[in-house]
Amino acid sequence: MNRIIVLFLLTAILLTSCAAPVEEAPATPEMTVLETTVPETTESPTTVATEPPEERFLLTFVGDCTFGANPSNTYAGYGFPKTVGEDYQYPFRNVITWFEKDEVTFLNLEGPLSDTGNPMQKKHVFRGTTAYVNILTENSVEAVSIANNHTMDYGQTGYDSTVETLQNAGIPFVGQGCSSIFSTENGLTIGLFGAVYYKLDTEEIVSYIAGLRDAGCDLVIFAPHWGVEGSYRPTDSQVNLAHAVIDAGADIVWGSHPHVLQPVEKYKDGIIFYSMGNFSFGGNGYPRDYDTALLQQEVIRSADGTVTLGDLTIIPANVSSIEGRNNFQPTPYEQGTAGYDRVMQKLDGSWKGSNLPIQ
């Protein structure tokens, strides 16, 4: 796992405070210049000025991860808790190779990590134990979004437990209206902002995105939880908001909520992942769509400090490593298979399948 330095966490529209400890940047040391006199008989050496080479970073984005299950589900006998047990490397065993090669792996943590609390009165409620934070720390997952509609499934108690658990593990995160700024071990400073669909105020979001850019972030990422469940295409409002935040200074829009893949769009100098679908999703033992993907985005920092996006690598995958049901272990499709081609079509917008009805 790459070491992540949490610089500071900004709070905006919060269900509760998601402030994290502030780590101040070290003071710049004073530099003393010593003057020397070179004898006239000595030739000055010729110095060839060389610019430092450009730096390349790799970021991995995946979709919805529910480490736990709905207590009222009908597949408890082989649900997430029973399947995983204390084998915290199990969920990402078939994708860890990609996670370990990057600077930061991002996932949407859909559901609280809490050992106490009462479930909300709603159809789908999810919860995982606080021990499941080890799934993140043991699998090179460096940052998460908890800006989603399941974070409060166990009320304020569950939410507070999740925040405390992530903070204690040193994992940067964003919730609704929350901005996090952190730096990778190799010095890439990332600003991350999260928002949920029922509080997507464009003007306010654009303001915070611009603020992250003004704060000196090398890279700005917006993590919206938005769109229509089961829809393979973004809504007009998604498109408009995505374009607005990139115009305001965001580099990457990393969307979630529909539980299916939606297209990737290159817009100006940025890129938009409208929906990443499910990934290791304990909330459904029999999903109607098993397709998912890992998206690996290259980031290039030039010698003058300019940061641009490089190549995007797509790894099409199945949310399960077995046929017939979900075993919560995402596994890449082999190139040339129907699943591989189907994922690529969903991401390039050429998929012609019908949307799934909301359940």
Where are these regions (language model features)?
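Generic cytosolic/nucleocytoplasmic N-terminal low-complexity/intrinsically disordered segments
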Residues: 1-2, 39
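Sec-dependent signal peptide recognition
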Residues: 2-9
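A taxonomically broad motif for mature regions of secreted/extracellular
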Residues: 5, 23-24
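Hydrophobic alpha-helical targeting segments used for export or membrane insertion
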Residues: 9-10, 221
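N-terminal leader/targeting segments
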Residues: 11-12, 193
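C-terminal motif of bacterial Sec signal peptides marking the signal peptidase cleavage site
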Residues: 14-17
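Acidic, metal/ion-coordinating pockets
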Residues: 19-23, 29-359
